[in-house]
Regions:
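Short, Lys/Arg-enriched anionic-surface-contact patches
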Residues: 16-37
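Major-groove recognition helix of helix-turn-helix-like DNA-binding domains
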Residues: 1, 64-83
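Catalytic cores of nuclease domains that cleave nucleic-acid phosphodiester backbones
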Residues: 156-236
Length: 307
């Protein structure tokens, strides 16, 4: 009888220990949820919503009791490394909630959620009116048939000189900030794009379709630019790569060079006004597509590009 009691007691101890172990992930999930709430609160506020409305929205969505002082601290801390006060003020004064315009393209069976930030586009693109026209008219002018086949020549590899910059680049910081606030079900790629489109000072669009026919190479090029920025008087094409350091530099740089060439052709903006880069949370690689010398043989044709 005593042996039976000891067996039952041991089983009860094991069950209690199992319950304690199972409770730990819940605390971790709670922490993850809180960091998600911080990122979503900042984004909702930066879309032009007031502190009061942001609190109401977040508390209702997550069934929380977020305090005003906590939200204000999050906002102030974010502004310290990405000061977008001027953009938000303009949104509140002029745009009445009409901030993000979006349209989904289905290309080769994949859905691409093209979006542009209208206030930032209006504020930053004074010198690039043809780019504005290109973005606004994509919904009706993007040729579906050009994207049905694989428009990029995977064998094309150009010798492009790329400069590596430090991890403290703002793009890396924003990617790091946004990636800390996702769960296992979220697509990190789209999370970074959405967060930068809403909160970054220079990002005007994401998942931008581009296409053209490179007549010298006799190659059709089509694809989607992850992020489009306006800064330092130039148009930046950014590609988010979760492990940027391990990427094949020639492959990524070639793709970005061709996308920049295509966007230059479509908008009539000189290639000298473009910059190309790819990045993750720790690394940022950039090059000027107009400063590249290379030769490449494709389809039995030798193509030279010299300055």
């Amino acid at each position: 009888m005593d042996e039976k009691k000891n067996t039952i007691k041991n089983k009860n101890i094991k069950v209690r220990n199992k319950i304690k172990k199972e409770k730990k992930p819940n605390n971790q999930n709670k922490k993850i949820d809180n960091t998600k709430i911080m990122a979503n609160s900042i984004s909702y506020y930066n879309l032009g919503n007031s502190i009061e409305n942001t609190l109401k929205h977040i508390n209702g969505k997550y069934n929380k009791k977020l305090e005003e002082r906590t939200l204000q601290k999050w906002i102030n801390d974010f502004v310290k490394f990405c000061n977008n006060k001027r953009i938000r003020t303009t949104i509140v004064e002029k745009y009445n909630g009409n901030v993000i315009n979006s349209y989904s393209f289905e290309h080769s069976g994949v859905i691409y959620n093209f979006k542009y930030h209208k206030p930032k586009m209006d504020m930053l693109c004074d010198n690039f009116p043809t780019l504005v026209g290109y973005l606004i008219n994509l919904k009706k002018e993007c040729p579906q048939e050009f994207f049905e086949n694989d428009g990029n020549d995977s064998n094309l590899s150009l010798d492009i000189k790329v400069a590596e910059q430090g991890k403290y680049n703002l793009a890396c910081q924003l990617a790091d900030f946004s990636m800390k606030h996702i769960d296992g079900q979220s697509d990190g790629h789209s999370v970074v794009e959405k967060f930068m489109l809403i909160n970054d000072c220079s990002t005007i669009a994401c998942e931008v379709p581009v296409w053209f026919w490179e007549k010298f190479l006799d190659v059709g090029i089509s694809g989607h630019i992850d992020l489009l920025q306006i800064r330092r008087g130039c148009v930046y094409l950014l590609d988010y790569k979760p492990d940027a350091k391990r990427e094949n530099r020639k492959t990524v740089a070639t793709q970005l060079f061709l996308y920049a060439s295509g966007l230059s052709f479509r908008t009539k903006i000189p290639l000298s006004k473009f910059r190309c880069a790819w990045f993750d949370q720790n690394n940022y690689y950039e090059f000027n597509p107009d400063e590249q010398n290379f030769s490449v043989k494709i389809k039995n044709k030798l193509y030279f590009r010299k300055l």
